[in-house]
Amino acid sequence: EKGTRRVLGRGTAVGKLAKQMLGRTPESITAVRPLTDGVITDFELCEAMLEYFIKKSSRHRLLKPRVVIAVPGGITPVEKRAVFNSAERAGAGRVYLIDESKAAGIGAGLPISEPMASMVCDIGGGTTEIAILSLAETVVSRSIRIGGDEMDEAIVDYMKQHYSLRIGTQAAESIKIEAGSAFPMDGERTAEVRGVDTISGVPRKAVVTSEEIREALREPLEAILIAIRGVIEQCQPELAADIVDTGM
């Protein structure tokens, strides 16, 4: 809430519930992203969000839980310290920071502890983490501040330029999920989108195809591909040979 900076719903308007409010709030209320591109942009609200998550997941109110937070590999030590301190102030007992790429490898069940290469490309909301892992360590990695949010903005721009239709990022994300792809699919899809005509100012809808969404996503996807290629080029030949067999 503007002015008081109070979190609605007695502090429960967090996460998916808050995301649903993006672009739909009255002037007195603001839906905020306390983290942008993997970096804290609003410390007070970030701590409120973490406090909510910790309370929701904690079974014992008297015991402070251990918290593991995945952070982009490209953030600075100062930014890491900010995340660490915010988690502590939010009620965490012990705080552990782990690179997003390593967390993604563990979550995907990859054999990152083995003496062989495992390659990960984790496309998040604000960043994309690319890494080659071996023996539980990161051999080569790169973090770029391009992710799902950038793709949503690209779709918003495409709809405005080609359809004279103004849509929000939530609608763009729905189109991306429903019809988006990096390569042609066997069965091309279509998605219906509603927005406001930029010329008449009247609400209307349009239907877009997978091919159009691929065109809209071309620039952010090309940036990710260039980063992937750069990581592979820095990799040792033996590990690169593993990637030929194991893929990404």
Predicted segments, located by residue:
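Nucleotide/phosphate-binding catalytic cleft detector across ATP-hydrolyzing
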Residues: 1-123, 131-248
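Conserved Rossmann-like nucleotide-cofactor binding loop
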Residues: 126
